[in-house]
A protein has these predicted regions:
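Short, structurally constrained coil/turn elements
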Residues: 13, 41, 92, 181-184
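General small-molecule cofactor/ligand-binding pocket signal
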Residues: 20, 97-99, 188-191
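Mobile active-site "lid"/loop adjacent to the S-adenosyl-L-methionine
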Residues: 120-149
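Conserved Class I SAM-dependent methyltransferase catalytic core
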Residues: 144-201
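SAM/dcSAM-binding transferase cores
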Residues: 198-231
């Protein structure tokens, strides 16, 4: 597998996964792995990974969670290329496909998936300093897509009873819950991530069910990077 001069190949999980990433551009964070482990998955599920990036969530689901098939959708051409090469590098062509496209204009049919997972850009467009590296800026700030865009796509892609899982800042949970409900996505599972036992919550992982009944299960918290502190 050829890589470009500005890329690296990194190995994870005792050699189970090899990942092509840019040396300096947008590299996946542990958030993606925590989300991929959090989402409720059945072996027969058909999964869509929105904003797939280099493909890390799709790859983890295929290798560690053994899902039947994952389709990744990625806006940026360079990241789409990396995701496709990562699939080939790990010989997972029969379990993962990646499409370049915009989640605001879905290239898949309605009701395509049992599960949608998304590690969206969650820094508000006007909050903080915008990274001059465009790939990082799009991945981290609500520049190209908003929370409503993500929920619109999730609702469109899911079959009734299907599940959407995402990760978002803990201090925006009330906003996420309210907007999920306006999209008929009932919050069903919640797990909070703390930097350490002495700090306020930083992130939250939420799973909603399309047209689900009310009732929220709150899972034990995660501190730091959880089991991914050593990879």
């Amino acid at each position: 597998m050829k890589i470009k001069p500005h890329e690296t190949i990194d190995t994870f999980f005792n050699g189970k996964l090899r990942i092509i990433q840019p040396r300096q551009g947008y590299r996946f964070s542990v958030d993606a792995l925590l989300l991929a482990e959090f989402v409720s998955i059945k072996s027969e599920d058909f999964v869509v990974d929105l904003g797939a990036g280099c493909g890390i969530i799709s790859l983890f689901l295929a290798v560690e969670r053994e899902v039947s098939f994952v389709v990744g959708l990625e806006l940026q051409e360079e990241l789409t290329s990396q995701a496709k090469r990562n699939i080939m590098l790990n010989e997972l062509e029969k379990k993962i496909a990646v499409i370049q496209g915009d989640l605001r204009h879905l290239p898949m049919a309605p009701g395509f998936a049992n599960v949608v997972v998304c590690n969206p850009p969650y820094r508000q467009g006007k909050s903080g300093r915008i990274n001059p590296d465009l790939s990082k800026a799009i991945a981290r700030h609500e520049i190209a897509v908003s929370l409503n865009d993500t929920l619109d796509a999730g609702k469109a892609l899911l079959r009734p009873g299907g599940r959407l899982a995402l990760i978002y800042p803990a201090n925006r949970l009330t906003e996420v819950f309210a907007k999920m409900r306006t999209h008929e996505l009932e919050p069903k599972r919640l797990q909070i991530i703390f930097p350490d036992s002495a700090s306020h919550a930083k992130l939250a992982m939420i799973e909603g069910r399309l047209q689900g009944k009310s009732g929220l299960k709150i899972l034990p918290p995660i501190f730091g990077q959880g089991r991914f502190s050593v990879m």
